[in-house]
């Protein structure tokens, strides 16, 4: 995800907290790998990764978000779906 895409997701202007947003973007691939098992090399192929990344950025950037429980449930559901996708990649490599 680019800084421009992240700013669009967060509804902020580029230049507003760019360093913070960039650090959150940098954390996404490793976080997704740890939580789902989906390797970063496969993350670009999965459309759900971009969706999950947007929700994660929103949760992390707006830590005091009033609707964080609904957001967390959505993130949990997407994480489970990507975990299944990661297993598919794992099984295809083993063949």
Regions found by a protein language model. Give the residues of each.
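Divalent metal-cofactor coordination and adjacent catalytic microenvironments
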Residues: 1-95
């Amino acid at each position: 995800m680019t800084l421009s895409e992240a700013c669009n997701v967060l509804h902020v202007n580029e230049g507003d907290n760019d360093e913070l947003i960039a650090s959150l973007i940098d954390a996404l691939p490793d976080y997704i790998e740890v939580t789902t098992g989906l390797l970063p090399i496969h993350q670009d192929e999965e459309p759900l990764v971009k969706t999950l990344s947007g929700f994660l950025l929103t949760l992390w950037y707006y830590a005091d978000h009033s609707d964080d429980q609904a957001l967390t449930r959505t993130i949990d559901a997407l994480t489970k779906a990507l975990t299944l996708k990661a297993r598919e990649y794992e099984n295809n490599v083993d063949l």
